[in-house]
Structure formats: C-alpha cells, structure tokens
C-alpha cells in the first residue's frame, strides 16, 4: 500500500497536484506534503474576509439592548438578506453541480456501457463509502448545521483527486465527445466554488474534516494513475467513477439545500 500524507501549501490553489498525490482542497491541500498549519490558517483567513456579512450580523445580534448606530433595523435586515442570498446562490450552484454530473454519467453510460454489467458493483466501488454519509433526506435533516456542512465538505474534498486525474485521462479516450470533457471541467470548477462557500460559512469544521480524511487517506492512492492496459477494465473504472460522482453530487445538493432552507426558515 502506498503511504500518503496530507499537507498544505501556503500559496495553494487548485492547479496541478503538489507531489505525486495531487491537490485535495480549495485551500491548497495536497497529498504528499507536510503539515503547515500557518499556511492553512492564512488561506482560511482570506476565505473569512469574504464572509464579513456573517460577522456583522453576529455583531448586531450581540448589540441588542445597547446603542449600536451601525446596526439599526434596516442594516440588520440588509445583512440578513445578504446572507440568505449567499445560501440561495450556493443551492443553485449545487443543483447545477448534480444536474451536470447526471448528464455526464448518462452520456457515458449510453456511449460505453450499453449491454455491460458495470452497474452491478458500481455502488460498492465508491471511494467515499467509508465515510457513511447520510443517503436519505430525512436522516440528513436530523443533523445539525455543523455536521451537515462537515459531510458536505468531506464529499467535496474527496472528489478533488479523482476529478483531477479523470480530466487528464478523458482526453485520451477514443470517440469521447468534447461535451463530456467540458462537463468534467465545469464540475471541477463548481466543486471548488462549493468548497469555498462551505469554508467561508463554517470555518471551524475545516481542520476536523481534514483530520477525518487523513484517517482514511488510503482511498486516494487508487487515483494516482487511471491508466489501464485492458480497455474494458478502463471503461469499467470510469463508469464507476461517473456513477459515484452522480450519487455524491446528489448528497451535496441535498445537504446544501437543507442548510439553505434553514437559513431562510422555510423548512
């Protein structure tokens, strides 16, 4: 088994992978590096700077009963609306994320998997199975916001490596439409944006999520290379990947929509 370690690059970003394992997160997380907590926290601070409306709302709440000229009724309503808008936009993005994942899976299935039995073991092969994330809405609704956002970020981080290597290999597949490649690129971009959203709204869950992923870091080694000599094996692996991405994107969409309806108080 290949040993992997999690590390963070202070300058980070989701470009090419840092070291053989590749990037894992929107914070510049990489496999194969060493821990740099100061670098991680600097990245988090920059995320937090974009979440000032949240902090201002909290400040106004703390000012109840005290004279706070900058936190009048109009200001509070405006800031609250701004926060709600952020969640609404995230819910729209997560919907598109799942929708595009479904379209990409359906196109791949139609072109490569007709008459095959790939679907039989597809669910069992998902690299995120070890996290036991809630499948059904009623179970997800029983979770508090912190746990729900934690599972959302776990799933999103878990797909950074597979998506990176998937994009590298898709370009070498014969007769694959440009639409599938474009969809994969857009899905990767959407995932980065959703990660940034969760990181900015639920800052304190980031380190626990990274530790959780570190405990099952063996799940990444499978994607260090997706090149197979047998074409049928290769197509089977891609099928499983598309299948699992569709499943996990549905979970992400469901979790974010629950968080949004709670923020809007419409649940």
UniProtKB/Swiss-Prot annotation:
Its main location: secreted. Coiled coil: none annotated. Placental prolactin-related proteins may play a specific role during gestation. GO terms for cellular component: extracellular space. It holds the Pfam family Hormone_1. One of its GO terms (molecular function) is hormone activity. One of its GO terms (biological process) is positive regulation of lactation. The keyword Secreted applies. It is found in: Secreted. CDD domains: prolactin_like. It comes from the Eukaryota. PROSITE patterns: SOMATOTROPIN_1, SOMATOTROPIN_2. Glycans are attached at residues 99, 121. Gene3D superfamilies: 1.20.1250.10. This is Placental prolactin-related protein 2. Transmembrane segments: none annotated. Belongs to the somatotropin/prolactin family. The lineage of its organism: Eukaryota, Metazoa, Chordata, Craniata, Vertebrata.
């Amino acid at each position: 088994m290949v040993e992997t370690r999690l590390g963070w690059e202070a300058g980070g970003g989701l470009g090419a992978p840092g070291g053989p394992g590749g990037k894992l997160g929107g914070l510049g997380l990489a496999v194969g590096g060493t821990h740099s907590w100061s670098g991680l926290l600097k990245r988090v601070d920059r995320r937090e700077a974009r979440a000032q409306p949240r902090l201002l709302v909290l400040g106004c709440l703390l000012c109840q009963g005290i004279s706070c000229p900058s936190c009048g009724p109009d200001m509070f309503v405006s800031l609250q609306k701004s926060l709600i808008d952020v969640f609404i936009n995230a819910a729209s993005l997560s919907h598109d994320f799942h929708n595009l994942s479904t379209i990409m899976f359906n196109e791949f299935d139609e072109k490569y998997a007709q008459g095959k039995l790939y679907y039989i073991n597809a669910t069992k092969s998902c690299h995120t199975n070890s996290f036991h994330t809630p499948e059904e809405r009623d179970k997800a609704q029983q979770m508090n916001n912190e746990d729900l956002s934690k599972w959302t970020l776990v799933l999103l981080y878990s797909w950074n490596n597979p998506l990176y290597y998937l994009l590298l290999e898709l370009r070498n597949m014969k007769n694959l439409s440009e639409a599938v490649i474009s969809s994969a690129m857009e899905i990767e971009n959407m995932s980065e944006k959703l990660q940034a959203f969760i990181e900015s709204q639920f800052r304190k869950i980031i380190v626990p999520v990274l530790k959780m992923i570190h405990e099952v870091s063996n799940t990444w080694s499978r994607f260090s290379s997706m090149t197979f000599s047998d074409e049928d094996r290769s197509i089977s692996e891609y099928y499983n990947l598309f299948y699992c991405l569709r499943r996990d994107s549905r979970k992400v969409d469901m979790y974010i929509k629950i968080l949004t309806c709670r923020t809007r108080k419409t649940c």
